[in-house]
Amino acid sequence: MDSPAFFFTIFLWCLLLSITGYSIYVGFGPPSQQLRDPFEEHED
């Protein structure tokens, strides 16, 4: 448990988990109302 690789792995796992959680929050949570949809803006 004193290995630096163990703590580095835990750090990377937490970083990846937090980035994923934030992306889901921005994509589907309350901030998603401010996102624009380029397909809706494009007129054929």
Curated annotation (Swiss-Prot):
Primary localization class, coarse: plastid
Keywords: Chloroplast, Membrane, Plastid, Thylakoid, Transmembrane, Transmembrane helix
Residues annotated as transmembrane: 6-26
GO CC terms of this entry: chloroplast thylakoid membrane
Locations listed in the record: Plastid, Chloroplast thylakoid membrane
Annotated function: May play a role in photosystem I and II biogenesis.
Similarity comment text for this entry: Belongs to the PsbN family.
Protein name (database record): Protein PsbN
Native source organism of the sequence: Chlorella vulgaris (Green alga)
